[in-house]
């Protein structure tokens, strides 16, 4: 996935910053009061990579290999909330830190939280809390919303959070429909939306 490739490039740049290595001129423009370019606690940061294939089982297998064969003490990355939750569980079992990458689901640090898991990325609840006042200011408090939701942990918590935030400001939720995760043709979902009386479609 493109998101995974972007994450990898960011991690590689971060390692170069931490280790004080040349990074195409970026380091000279970066200033930090805490990074000294000598790794972490004076130890050079090394990394290995794996491929989640955006599948929980493949992600767990890749992370397990990095922990057992490469001696990883921290796992990070993944561009799916389902992957993040699966790998976080493995890291908890192995006593390894998990720093969540792209996971937008509330559940990553909510109902599926682990003591070894951390996130720096915002979640569905935060998105809804920030979005609701903007929607209200721009579109008012008397809208009918129809939700088409990806049927997995991110979609569920995003739907729940946005519905709660918009209903609290007066919007009506007309319907919530979950779509298969691997769906590519959404044409069969359009007619019910158009016939629902909704004036807002939430994806």
Report residues per predicted region:
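Signal peptide-proximal N-terminal region
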Residues: 9-47, 167-171
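Structural motif
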Residues: 76, 202-203
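Short beta->alpha junction loops
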Residues: 34, 39, 49-56, 175-185
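Extracytoplasmic ligand/sensor domains, especially the bilobed periplasmic-binding protein
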Residues: 69-178, 184
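Extracytoplasmic "Venus flytrap"
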Residues: 1-20, 51-56, 79-80, 148-157
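Extracytoplasmic
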Residues: 6, 42-44, 61, 70, ...
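Short, well-structured alpha-helical segments in soluble
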Residues: 49, 53-73, 136-138, 184-197
């Amino acid at each position: 996935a493109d998101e995974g490739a972007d994450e990898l490039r960011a991690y590689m740049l971060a390692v170069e910053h931490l280790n004080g290595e040349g990074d195409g001129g970026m380091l000279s423009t970066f200033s930090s009061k805490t990074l000294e370019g000598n790794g972490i606690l004076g130890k050079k940061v090394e990394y290995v990579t794996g491929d989640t294939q955006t599948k929980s089982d493949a992600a767990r297998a890749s992370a397990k290999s990095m922990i057992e064969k490469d001696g990883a003490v921290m796992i990070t990355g993944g561009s799916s909330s389902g992957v993040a939750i699966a790998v976080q569980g493995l890291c908890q079992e192995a006593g390894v830190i998990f720093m969540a990458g792209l996971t937008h689901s509330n559940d990553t640090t909510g109902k599926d939280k682990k003591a070894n898991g951390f996130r720096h990325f915002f979640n569905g609840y935060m998105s809804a809390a920030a979005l609701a006042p903007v929607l209200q200011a721009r579109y008012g408090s008397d809208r009918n919303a129809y939700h088409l939701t990806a049927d997995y942990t991110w979609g569920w918590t995003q739907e729940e959070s946005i519905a709660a935030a918009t209903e609290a400001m007066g919007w009506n939720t007309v319907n919530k429909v979950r779509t298969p995760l691997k769906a590519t043709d959404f044409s069969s979902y359009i007619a019910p939306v158009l016939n629902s009386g909704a004036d807002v479609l939430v994806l």
